[in-house]
Design a protein with these regions (language model features):
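Carbohydrate-associated surface elements
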Residues: 116
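Conserved beta-strand positions that form and line the central face of beta-propeller blades
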Residues: 41, 113, 499
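Gly/Ser-rich phosphate-binding catalytic loop and adjacent alpha/beta segment
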Residues: 119
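Intrinsically disordered, low-complexity sequence elements enriched in Ser/Thr/Gly/Pro
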Residues: 22-24, 113, 135, 300
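Short beta-strand-loop/turn "lid" adjacent to the catalytic site in phosphate-handling enzymes
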Residues: 76-113, 133-135, 168-180, 184-189, ...
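Active-site core segments that coordinate phosphate-bearing ligands/cofactors
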Residues: 2-10, 16-17, 83, 124-137, ...
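N-terminal glycine/serine-rich phosphate-binding loop of ATP-dependent small-molecule kinases
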Residues: 1-110, 124-125, 156, 217, ...
Length: 532
């Protein structure tokens, strides 16, 4: 007999996932079939303190408590009951950054988030030393930059971790990290499912002259993979989450993960030859590889799935913000003439109209650079629209050129994977704001990366659902399936989403667009140099 959602909660068989995003903390409660049955959220913002982006320790715990209180409220309203016991819990958060603690568990400097770019010197030196692309936002870049800057706190370090790792440690007492999140601290060896020992040794030799009382391997969290037990909720941990006191200690907790890994899980993209694209304010693509790349590339970050498979990630700072600004301009026009129109209708109408334009957007070009874009060599950005007098200047082409621009940098990064490394992919699943209007964003992306693109209804549930699925995989995987098979058979069975294949005309049109885009990049560089 099928259990109701209320019975699932009362019998302690629900699973909880909580993810700390950059602007929102979200909690999702799922039933034994992995369906969301309740949720809560809390908005928060980073602060710029002494030139560095951070969230305070107080904001982290207040945010978690507010989010959980909102979840309790939803459970009470829907089912008139309290959450007391759970089958499992999982925590995830934005990856990378730097949280350093001393022997007594005190944080030594304010949490430095992934957004900080003060680590250029360290990242460049480590990339050369490791013969591996080390991005600015990775934890090892932050640590080494602190060393290069002679920061006094470094000698007192006992433990460094990520935001998800910190929360997990505080509520379970375990200094561990899921392999996907760990891969954003320091490179991972997918063969042994642990940090790359050669790189650890190289780092220790590099900093040996400083005579610190620690070795790198002793201050990093222990690496765990999906399905591992990562500890149990302590009484103190339960009180930190649920200020009402209803939540009980002893609940098993899965390895804490990063937002890249939970995004892969939420889109069923952890299997080799699959991938996913997230496209909103910023964008990234992640392709699960069959074999290692032949060499490092500055525009490709190597991370892993939550079960340790190697993943090539292309990250773009800009995606839909400039496009949104143009749509808002059309909304302003509507208001000026007294036209009342819902924003969803405005987006949908303009996006659909864009498909009536030319595949190459009639020669029109847009650079959507609200901020800098490392892949195209820009440390700053200036949103720019460029056309010549002979281009086909129409509304459809104008919107299409901005849609093309939203995935232009993704195209440039992924061309390396497909053209130079000959990476094979069977399925890419897309999620994010760009795909809210059915078919349009999907078609544009399919043409840009020359691959069929699927969109699933559930992908909108995002990372909190992804970490809930990982917690369920640990607690409910009675058949001992691999993570790939568990997701395929227990979660996504029969849900392939809607797939769109790019046409030859669309691919050729986008190729023409991106050729124009690349040849005119000098205009964007000039705009950055001259427009203040």
């Amino acid at each position: 007999m099928k259990m109701t959602a209320k019975e699932t909660i009362l019998q302690g068989k629900a699973v909880l996932g909580i993810e700390f995003g950059s602007t929102r903390i979200k909690a999702i409660l799922i039933d034994e079939k992995s369906n969301p049955i309740a949720q809560g959220s809390h908005e928060w913002e980073n602060q710029l303190v002494d030139g560095l982006w951070t969230y305070s320790i107080d904001a982290i715990w207040q945010g978690l408590q507010e989010c959980y209180t909102d979840l309790r409220r939803d459970v009470k309203e829907q089912y008139d009951c309290e959450v007391e016991n759970l089958a499992a819990i999982g925590f995830s958060a934005m990856m990378h950054g730097y949280m350093a603690f001393n022997k007594t568990g005190q944080i030594l400097v304010p949490f430095r988030t992934w957004r900080n770019t003060n680590t250029a010197e360290a990242a460049a030196k480590l990339s050369e030393l490791f013969v591996f692309n080390i991005p600015l936002r990775w934890s090892i870049s932050h640590l080494y930059q602190c060393i290069l800057d002679n920061d006094a706190h470094v000698k007192d370090i006992d433990f460094i971790t990520t935001l998800a790792g910190y929360i997990h440690w505080q509520v379970t007492g375990e200094k561990v990290l899921g392999i996907g999140d760990a891969s954003g601290m320091l490179p991972i060896d997918s063969n042994c499912l642990d940090y790359d020992t050669k790189m650890v040794e190289k780092f220790n030799r590099l900093v040996s002259s400083y005579n610190y009382p620690w070795k790198l391997e002793n201050i990093l969290p222990k690496v765990l993979v999906a399905g591992d037990n990562a500890g149990y909720l302590t009484p103190e941990g339960a009180a930190l989450i649920d200020i009402s006191g209803h939540l009980k200690a002893g609940i098993p907790v899965c390895p804490p993960e990063g937002d890249a890994g939970t995004g892969m899980v939420a889109t069923n993209a952890v299997k080799k030859r699959t991938g996913n694209v997230s496209a909103g304010t910023s964008s990234f693509s992640m392709i699960v590889l069959e074999k290692e790349l032949s060499k490092p590339y500055e525009m490709i970050d190597m991370v892993t799935t939550p079960n340790g498979n190697a993943v090539a990630m292309v990250h773009c700072n800009n995606c839909t913000s400039d496009l949104n600004a143009w749509i808002n301009l059309f909304n302003e026009y509507n208001k000026l003439f007294g036209i009342e129109m819902d924003m969803n209708k405005l987006y949908g109408t303009l996006y659909r109209h864009a498909l009536e334009g030319d595949a190459d957007s009639g020669g029109l070009i847009s650079y959507n650079y609200i901020s800098g874009e490392p892949i195209t060599g820009l440390s700053e950005g200036r949103p720019l629209f460029v056309r010549s007098s002979t281009d086909k200047f129409s509304l459809a082409n104008f919107i299409r050129c901005h849609l093309n621009a939203s995935v232009g940098v993704l195209n440039i990064g992924n061309d390396i994977l497909f053209n130079e490394e000959h990476v094979q992919v069977d399925r890419i699943t897309a999620h994010g704001g760009l795909f809210k209007t059915p078919e349009v964003g999907q078609r544009i992306l399919a043409a840009a990366i020359k691959t069929p693109i699927s969109v699933m209804e559930t992908a909108g549930e995002g990372g909190a659902w992804g970490i809930a699925l990982l917690a369920a995989f640990m607690a409910n995987n009675v058949q001992k399936l691999s993570l790939e098979d568990y997701l395929e058979k227990e979660v996504f069975y029969g849900n392939r989403g809607t797939e769109i294949q790019p046409t030859t005309e669309e691919i050729e049109g986008f190729n023409k667009y991106i050729s124009n885009y690349k040849s005119c990049l000098k205009v964007e560089h000039a705009a950055v140099e001259t427009k203040r």
